[in-house]
Amino acid sequence: MAVATVDHRLRAQAADEAAMVAARCRELVVPHVTLVADEPVAGASVQARAREVRYRLLARWADSAGVEAVATAHHADDQAETFLMRAARGSGLAGLAGVRARAVIGGAVVVRPLLDWRRAELRAIARRREMPFVDDPSNQDLRYDRARARRLLDEHEWLGPANIARSAAYLAEADADLRATVDWLWAARATVDGDDVRVDAAGLPREVRRRLARRAVAAAREAAGIAEPAFTDATNVEALLDGLEAGKRVTQSGVLASVREGRWRLRPAPLRRG
């Protein structure tokens, strides 16, 4: 086992906090390293950018250190906060499933073994064992969505963070099952010939078609080397689906899609002249 602490360089106190972790690890004879952000963490969403940088650094460290999995301390309250934040943004099934117990991020296997535990329970254990810990002041900064969600849960215990976390786990299970179904349908109904992608989507439910559409667009973009505009497995494809349902030709993220008798064809969109 080894421990890594990420210093995002967002707060002056972070270096001292990393040193505290390093000292505790020395007492336990556990290898420790502090990973310092190698680029400024800034932008419209500082917390989202910090997460991106954090997991990139952890993935790089895991690879170089031969670590099989990175374990994080996300707990049930974190899960409930994530659920509320994403519900407020109108997220679908995959988003409401929240933080996964196991995921691959940046090539690293990430596990979260504490998702069934409440924050207060973990604090109590740490105090009984006289384990030092630090409260991140940004968790109380109401400029951030997560801090506002945390305040809401703290002030309204009836919301039941543990129950919300349990619901997120059920949704994660449903999302995984649906993902497996889409994998099977992709193998059975899709053909990829270079940057020419064809999918038989006839008779399929909209959520299945939504996921197949994202995969088809991604496949065409990858084959054609299209990098801009950005496209992820969370990109909104509703206009694309609506257009295909109406029998129209539609462009999505640099890919031209057309339909005939329920069969889609996606290929790179022609470059605009002028």
Where on the chain are the PLM-derived regions?
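Core alpha/beta nucleotide-donor-binding catalytic domains of modification enzymes
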Residues: 1-152
